[in-house]
């Protein structure tokens, strides 16, 4: 695996020897704007691999994306290889509809330490929940970013990441009540501890998310990519464009329903990916928001 191939994949051309917060943010933003958060392999009859070589081949060589375990594992490898001080952490995701955290550790997170300060770097939450900058590991501090305000809070040995969101405007009346829309302005995202993890600890979660009837990743085909203005999401045949803060404290969310024949072209032109196998688009009944 070649680190320069990774940097070419994400379009990063700046110096590699600056291990500061500015460089970390720059690398991170290049990845989230070029590597989609997606689970399309499942809906092409393939498996979501957790082996680093397989992930590198999928994302770097074949120009695909991946879900959190894949894109954050690749980011962890890239930052470590570049020379950053990194730690792999594990998260427990909060369900928006249940307001409860998962019992299993199903989310991979990267911690980066720079000049004694710790930052959470997560390229794999996608949709409008995706951070655009590293979040400093400080309890109770609002950290405003373009997508929203992020806030970490510490209780005992557990850290909780929350999001304070803007209002949203949906111009198409047909989609005002869409179940894909996040209704909460204060959203709990996930919790984690600072215990270092290894990739082997995520193998059971990687399998579970592909086979469990309660997994939204089995229930829905998902592709999400950050843009300079917002985020594009494709869930089944429903394509959305979110523009952050298009007017004061309000996001613009536009919907479009695709035909099966349009999906391949949309993946190429909007998400910059091509699939090697036939995609069976799916948007089942499990709760999932963008």
UniProtKB/Swiss-Prot annotation:
State the compartments where it is located: Cytoplasm
Q: Please name the top-level EC class of this enzyme.
A: transferase
EC number(s) for this protein? 2.3.1.5
Q: Give each disulfide bond as a residue pair.
A: none
A GO MF term:
arylamine N-acetyltransferase activity
Record GO cellular component, one term: cytoplasm
Extent of the signal sequence = none
Catalytic activity, as annotated: an arylamine + acetyl-CoA = an N-acetylarylamine + CoA
Task: Name the positions where substrate binds.
Answer: 106-107
Q: Entry's Gene3D superfamilies? A: 3.30.2140.20
Q: At what positions is N-acetylmethionine found?
A: 1
**Chain positions recorded as CoA binding sites:** 103-104, 208, 214
Q: Keywords in UniProt for this one?
A: Acetylation, Acyltransferase, Cytoplasm, Transferase
Q: Which family does it belong to?
A: Belongs to the arylamine N-acetyltransferase family.
**UniProt-recorded name of the protein:** Arylamine N-acetyltransferase 1
* Organism of this sequence: Oryctolagus cuniculus
